[in-house]
Regions:
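Conserved small/polar residues in nucleotide/adenosyl-binding loops
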Residues: 174-179
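Accessory C-terminal segments flanking Radical SAM cores
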Residues: 2-119, 124-132, 153
Length: 181
């Protein structure tokens, strides 16, 4: 397996798949809040496609951490590939400091360890050090980069304007009562 460290010119490497896990209010597990991974359950705030199905499938961390998907992501990132899951950072879609920079700066002392503790199949023995678990979309802000699944304010506004997609009713598991007013 080809391995290129950031200090050797790898511009796409990100520490998130080695140290971080994210769960959305819709209980989708992903690499981080900005990753564009195939949805197991529902459309996410950053997705542009319909949900894969209507059945809720919760993915435990143990199954996710060294899943085929995560191993593939790690291998591709270590090889310096620009992967579609990381389009938000690759193309700076949020017009801000990209999450990749945050993870690589904050966990810079673990980069060599990530390369050492990842085998040729992409499996790692590193443990999660950062959890971003969002159990609700309750939020009084309406940030432009957000949307109804992560902001009850956006949810309320969309309902008022008749822009609330019917399928989203099933995926907003923990919405506020105010959103229904």
């Amino acid at each position: 397996m080809k391995k290129i460290k950031p200090k050797d010119g790898n511009k796409t490497f990100c520490m998130a798949p080695w140290v971080h896990t994210f769960i959305s209010p819709q209980m989708e597990r992903r690499m981080c809040c900005a990753s564009r991974e195939p949805s197991m359950n529902f459309k996410q705030y950053i997705d542009s496609s319909k949900p894969a199905n209507d059945e809720l499938k919760l993915l435990p961390l143990k199954e996710h951490w060294n899943s085929d998907h995560m191993k593939s992501v790690r291998k591709r990132l270590m090889a310096g590939e620009e992967i579609p899951e990381c389009a938000t950072c690759n193309h700076k879609l949020l017009n801000a400091q990209v999450y990749r920079q945050h993870f690589n700066r904050f966990y810079r002392d673990g980069i060599d360890e990530a390369f050492e503790k990842t085998n040729d199949e992409g499996e790692t023995s590193m443990q999660v050090a950062s959890w971003d678990y969002r159990f609700s979309n309750l939020c009084s802000f309406s940030c432009r980069m957000c949307g109804p699944p992560l902001s009850s304010s956006w949810e309320t506004e969309n309902k008022k304007q008749g822009k609330f997609e019917p399928w989203m009713q099933n995926c907003l598991l923990y919405t506020s009562d105010a959103a229904d007013e």
